[in-house]
UniProtKB/Swiss-Prot annotation:
Residues 27-47 bind DNA. It comes from Listeria monocytogenes serovar 1/2a (strain ATCC BAA-679 / EGD-e). Transmembrane segments: none annotated. This is LexA repressor. It catalyses: Hydrolysis of Ala-|-Gly bond in repressor LexA. Represses a number of genes involved in the response to DNA damage (SOS response), including recA and lexA. In the presence of single-stranded DNA, RecA interacts with LexA causing an autocatalytic cleavage which disrupts the DNA-binding part of LexA, leading to derepression of the SOS regulon and eventually DNA repair. The gene is lexA. The lineage of its organism: Bacteria, Bacillati, Bacillota, Bacilli, Bacillales. Its EC number is 3.4.21.88. GO terms for cellular component: protein-DNA complex. GO terms for molecular function: DNA-binding transcription repressor activity; sequence-specific DNA binding; serine-type endopeptidase activity. Belongs to the peptidase S24 family. The record marks 90-91 as: Cleavage. One of its GO terms (biological process) is negative regulation of DNA-templated transcription.
Protein backbone atom coordinates (compact mmCIF):
# COMPACT_ATOMS: atom_id res chain seq x y z
CA UNK A 1 0.00 0.00 0.00
CA UNK A 2 1.47 3.32 -1.09
CA UNK A 3 1.35 6.25 1.32
CA UNK A 4 3.34 9.47 1.43
CA UNK A 5 6.39 9.99 3.62
CA UNK A 6 4.39 12.39 5.80
CA UNK A 7 1.56 9.90 6.22
CA UNK A 8 4.06 7.19 7.10
CA UNK A 9 5.60 9.46 9.73
CA UNK A 10 2.16 10.19 11.19
CA UNK A 11 1.21 6.51 11.18
CA UNK A 12 4.46 5.49 12.88
CA UNK A 13 4.09 8.23 15.49
CA UNK A 14 0.54 7.16 16.35
CA UNK A 15 1.65 3.54 16.56
CA UNK A 16 4.59 4.35 18.84
CA UNK A 17 2.43 6.49 21.14
CA UNK A 18 -0.17 3.72 21.45
CA UNK A 19 2.56 1.19 22.25
CA UNK A 20 4.26 3.44 24.81
CA UNK A 21 1.28 5.09 26.51
CA UNK A 22 -1.68 2.88 25.73
CA UNK A 23 -3.67 5.65 24.06
CA UNK A 24 -3.28 7.67 20.84
CA UNK A 25 -1.87 11.20 20.57
CA UNK A 26 -3.95 14.33 20.01
CA UNK A 27 -4.05 16.10 16.65
CA UNK A 28 -1.85 18.83 18.12
CA UNK A 29 0.73 16.30 19.31
CA UNK A 30 0.78 14.65 15.88
CA UNK A 31 1.35 18.02 14.22
CA UNK A 32 4.20 18.89 16.57
CA UNK A 33 5.83 15.49 16.03
CA UNK A 34 5.87 15.69 12.24
CA UNK A 35 6.33 19.44 11.80
CA UNK A 36 2.81 20.46 10.77
CA UNK A 37 1.45 23.67 12.29
CA UNK A 38 -2.02 23.38 10.75
CA UNK A 39 -4.47 21.04 12.46
CA UNK A 40 -6.54 20.92 9.26
CA UNK A 41 -3.51 19.54 7.40
CA UNK A 42 -3.10 16.85 10.07
CA UNK A 43 -6.81 16.01 9.78
CA UNK A 44 -6.35 15.68 6.01
CA UNK A 45 -3.53 13.16 6.42
CA UNK A 46 -5.54 11.24 9.02
CA UNK A 47 -8.48 11.09 6.61
CA UNK A 48 -6.20 9.59 3.94
CA UNK A 49 -4.82 7.03 6.38
CA UNK A 50 -8.37 6.14 7.36
CA UNK A 51 -9.37 5.86 3.71
CA UNK A 52 -6.55 3.38 3.17
CA UNK A 53 -7.70 1.25 6.09
CA UNK A 54 -4.72 1.93 8.34
CA UNK A 55 -6.58 3.74 11.09
CA UNK A 56 -10.13 4.22 12.30
CA UNK A 57 -11.41 7.42 13.92
CA UNK A 58 -14.47 8.29 15.98
CA UNK A 59 -15.30 11.96 15.27
CA UNK A 60 -17.44 12.18 18.41
CA UNK A 61 -14.53 11.47 20.77
CA UNK A 62 -11.15 13.15 21.37
CA UNK A 63 -8.02 11.07 20.77
CA UNK A 64 -10.16 8.30 19.26
CA UNK A 65 -7.67 6.97 16.71
CA UNK A 66 -7.40 3.20 16.40
CA UNK A 67 -4.55 1.49 14.56
CA UNK A 68 -6.08 -1.20 12.35
CA UNK A 69 -2.81 -2.74 11.13
CA UNK A 70 -0.70 -2.72 14.27
CA UNK A 71 2.40 -4.83 13.85
CA UNK A 72 4.09 -6.46 16.79
CA UNK A 73 0.87 -6.44 18.80
CA UNK A 74 2.59 -8.32 21.58
CA UNK A 75 4.53 -5.16 22.35
CA UNK A 76 1.37 -3.11 22.89
CA UNK A 77 0.96 -2.45 26.62
CA UNK A 78 -2.03 -3.85 28.41
CA UNK A 79 -4.56 -1.25 29.47
CA UNK A 80 -6.67 -1.24 32.62
CA UNK A 81 -9.82 0.83 32.84
CA UNK A 82 -9.75 2.73 36.12
CA UNK A 83 -12.78 4.58 37.48
CA UNK A 84 -13.00 8.36 37.36
CA UNK A 85 -14.86 8.89 40.61
CA UNK A 86 -15.58 12.59 40.21
CA UNK A 87 -14.10 15.93 41.15
CA UNK A 88 -11.96 16.74 44.16
CA UNK A 89 -11.00 20.27 44.97
CA UNK A 90 -7.47 21.59 45.10
CA UNK A 91 -8.81 24.76 46.68
CA UNK A 92 -11.57 24.78 49.26
CA UNK A 93 -12.82 21.35 50.38
CA UNK A 94 -15.90 19.96 48.70
CA UNK A 95 -18.09 17.00 49.53
CA UNK A 96 -16.51 13.78 48.27
CA UNK A 97 -18.09 12.28 45.18
CA UNK A 98 -18.33 8.51 45.27
CA UNK A 99 -20.31 7.81 42.12
CA UNK A 100 -18.31 6.55 39.15
CA UNK A 101 -18.68 8.99 36.25
CA UNK A 102 -16.63 7.13 33.64
CA UNK A 103 -13.53 5.00 33.14
CA UNK A 104 -10.08 5.97 31.87
CA UNK A 105 -7.81 3.56 29.92
CA UNK A 106 -4.59 3.59 31.93
CA UNK A 107 -1.50 1.67 30.76
CA UNK A 108 -1.11 -1.29 33.10
CA UNK A 109 2.46 -0.41 34.06
CA UNK A 110 1.26 2.91 35.51
CA UNK A 111 -1.09 1.05 37.83
CA UNK A 112 1.83 -1.15 38.96
CA UNK A 113 -0.42 -4.20 38.85
CA UNK A 114 -2.71 -2.81 41.53
CA UNK A 115 -6.48 -2.85 41.35
CA UNK A 116 -7.09 -0.15 43.97
CA UNK A 117 -6.33 2.79 41.68
CA UNK A 118 -8.78 5.49 40.69
CA UNK A 119 -8.88 8.94 39.13
CA UNK A 120 -10.24 12.23 40.40
CA UNK A 121 -10.57 15.48 38.49
CA UNK A 122 -8.95 18.49 40.14
CA UNK A 123 -11.09 21.59 40.67
CA UNK A 124 -9.03 24.58 41.79
CA UNK A 125 -5.52 26.00 41.71
CA UNK A 126 -4.08 25.38 45.16
CA UNK A 127 -1.64 22.70 43.89
CA UNK A 128 -0.20 24.62 40.94
CA UNK A 129 3.33 24.80 42.41
CA UNK A 130 3.37 20.99 42.36
CA UNK A 131 2.38 21.01 38.69
CA UNK A 132 -1.23 19.95 39.39
CA UNK A 133 -3.54 22.31 37.52
CA UNK A 134 -7.26 22.98 37.47
CA UNK A 135 -8.90 20.32 35.28
CA UNK A 136 -6.10 17.75 35.63
CA UNK A 137 -7.04 14.19 36.48
CA UNK A 138 -4.89 12.77 39.27
CA UNK A 139 -4.16 9.05 39.51
CA UNK A 140 -4.68 7.94 43.11
CA UNK A 141 -3.64 4.70 44.80
CA UNK A 142 -5.95 3.88 47.69
CA UNK A 143 -4.04 4.00 50.95
CA UNK A 144 -5.03 4.89 54.49
CA UNK A 145 -1.71 6.39 55.62
CA UNK A 146 0.89 8.78 54.26
CA UNK A 147 4.39 10.07 54.94
CA UNK A 148 4.96 13.75 55.60
CA UNK A 149 5.31 15.64 52.34
CA UNK A 150 3.34 13.22 50.17
CA UNK A 151 0.48 14.52 48.04
CA UNK A 152 -2.76 12.89 49.11
CA UNK A 153 -6.48 12.97 48.68
CA UNK A 154 -7.80 13.33 52.21
CA UNK A 155 -11.22 13.50 53.82
CA UNK A 156 -12.01 15.54 56.90
CA UNK A 157 -14.44 14.71 59.69
CA UNK A 158 -17.00 16.83 57.82
CA UNK A 159 -16.90 14.29 54.96
CA UNK A 160 -15.17 16.73 52.65
CA UNK A 161 -12.34 15.70 50.31
CA UNK A 162 -9.37 17.72 49.15
CA UNK A 163 -6.03 17.22 47.37
CA UNK A 164 -3.11 18.60 49.37
CA UNK A 165 0.39 17.82 50.65
CA UNK A 166 0.14 15.90 53.94
CA UNK A 167 1.94 16.66 57.21
CA UNK A 168 1.38 15.12 60.63
CA UNK A 169 2.46 17.61 63.29
CA UNK A 170 2.48 17.74 67.10
CA UNK A 171 -1.15 18.61 67.78
CA UNK A 172 -2.81 18.44 64.40
CA UNK A 173 -2.64 17.41 60.77
CA UNK A 174 -1.70 19.99 58.16
CA UNK A 175 -2.97 19.81 54.60
CA UNK A 176 -0.63 22.17 52.80
CA UNK A 177 -1.53 23.76 49.46
CA UNK A 178 1.13 24.25 46.80
CA UNK A 179 0.12 27.85 46.15
CA UNK A 180 1.82 30.70 47.98
CA UNK A 181 -1.41 32.72 48.09
CA UNK A 182 -3.32 30.11 50.12
CA UNK A 183 -3.26 29.07 53.76
CA UNK A 184 -2.92 25.47 54.99
CA UNK A 185 -5.86 23.51 56.38
CA UNK A 186 -5.28 22.45 60.00
CA UNK A 187 -7.31 19.50 61.29
CA UNK A 188 -7.55 17.48 64.46
CA UNK A 189 -8.60 14.42 62.46
CA UNK A 190 -8.13 13.45 58.85
CA UNK A 191 -8.79 10.34 56.77
CA UNK A 192 -6.38 9.52 53.95
CA UNK A 193 -8.21 8.22 50.89
CA UNK A 194 -5.09 7.67 48.82
CA UNK A 195 -1.77 8.94 47.51
CA UNK A 196 -1.44 10.79 44.24
CA UNK A 197 0.90 8.74 42.03
CA UNK A 198 0.44 10.50 38.70
CA UNK A 199 -1.75 12.74 36.61
CA UNK A 200 -3.28 13.04 33.18
CA UNK A 201 -3.67 16.37 31.39
CA UNK A 202 -5.52 17.04 28.17
CA UNK A 203 -3.47 19.72 26.41
CA UNK A 204 -5.85 20.33 23.51
Amino acid sequence: MKISKRQQDIYEFIKSEVKEKGYPPSVREIGEAVGLASSSTVHGHLARLEGKGLIRRDPTKPRAIEILSLEDEAETPNVVNIPIIGKVTAGMPITAIENIDEYFPLPEYMAAGETNVFMLEIDGESMINAGILDGDKVIVRQESSAINGEIVVAMTDENEATCKRFYKEANHFRLQPENDALEPILLNNVTILGKVIGLYRDIR
